């Protein structure tokens, strides 16, 4: 019997896959537990429609990420920070991913989620820095930071 998997089933198939499985296994286990449904022409059509919609959504997300990357790659896109500095040259506050995200939104109107900014530890020094940001699973960019003394 041909079934469409509604969830990942270890050793049998992944969500969205159409596979031939034994009839008893399909009726008594997969369909009863809502792990799969019978592959009729209507359900196959629905699945293809969902996959097309998902691809379209992914393409839109990628295009949006590329637009953000284009803005971040411009030379004039440099996020400015003014921090108080102690006698040892270290800042009193630290620059975190959250602060970078907020300033990017405030200064350039570019919205980047703080979880996508790859910052090993908060920045506590003055100077110029480049911080990588993961905009999409296949697209990364660099945020340029200029931290000056207040």
Swiss-Prot record:
GO biological process: translation
Assigned keywords, A-Z: Ribonucleoprotein, Ribosomal protein, RNA-binding, rRNA-binding
Keyword rRNA-binding among UniProt keywords: yes
InterPro entries: Ribosomal_bL9, Ribosomal_bL9/RNase_H1_N, Ribosomal_bL9_bac/chp, Ribosomal_bL9_C, Ribosomal_bL9_C_sf, Ribosomal_bL9_N, Ribosomal_bL9_N_sf
Family annotation (PANTHER family): 50S RIBOSOMAL PROTEIN L9
The protein's role, per its UniProt record: Binds to the 23S rRNA.
Family that this chain belongs to: Belongs to the bacterial ribosomal protein bL9 family.
Protein name per Swiss-Prot or TrEMBL: Large ribosomal subunit protein bL9
Organism from which the protein derives: Streptococcus pyogenes serotype M5 (strain Manfredo)
